[in-house]
């Protein structure tokens, strides 16, 4: 059984990961602007994680490669605009000294969305499709939108991954991507 405080923290990390991963924004935005999407669930509870929320992933999966990333604090030279095709990690976490640490990471592909009179809208597509542990989720601290994001993410995981699995593996994946 997962202790309640760990469930609550895991749930906050999941909410944070999904809020950023579902972000929509106008072309010209930087990771500095969008980082608040991931940190808000923590900051609302006077919590934080002391690392950047994400970083670029480069050619041949080189890690921690610029030019873009997500962080709340300005650093000189890290103001690159997010562009179509950029892959950036979404990896919020929480670390309680002497107790536990939790981090969830997805890689996000930056995509163009609607172009209208307001400009070019952009969005992210999760390209790391792994279920989040539902046994560690506390649905009582999630609002309806949080639950919808999790259910939509899990439906996408099942839809895209299950065609590559045998029947037994599909049953396992179905159980771990069920709606809450």
Identify the residue ranges that each predicted region occupies.
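Active-site neighborhoods and metal-handling regions in enzymes and metal-associated proteins
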Residues: 1-180
């Amino acid at each position: 059984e997962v202790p309640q405080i760990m469930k609550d923290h895991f749930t906050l990390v999941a909410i944070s990961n999904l809020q950023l991963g579902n972000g929509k924004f106008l072309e010209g935005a930087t990771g500095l602007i969008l980082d608040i999407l991931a940190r808000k669930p923590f900051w609302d509870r006077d919590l934080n994680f002391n690392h950047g929320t994400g970083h670029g992933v480069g050619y041949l999966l080189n890690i921690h490669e610029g030019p873009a990333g997500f962080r709340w604090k300005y650093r000189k030279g890290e103001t690159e605009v997010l562009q179509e095709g950029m892959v950036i990690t979404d990896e919020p976490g929480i670390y309680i000294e002497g107790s536990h640490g939790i981090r969830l990471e997805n890689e996000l592909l930056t995509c163009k969305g609607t172009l209208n009179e307001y400009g070019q809208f952009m969005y992210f597509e999760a390209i790391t499709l792994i279920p989040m542990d539902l046994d560690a989720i506390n649905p009582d601290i999630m609002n309806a939108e949080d639950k919808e994001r999790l259910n939509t993410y899990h439906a996408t995981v099942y839809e895209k991954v299950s065609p590559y699995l045998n029947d037994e593996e599909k049953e396992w994946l179905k159980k771990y991507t069920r709606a809450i």
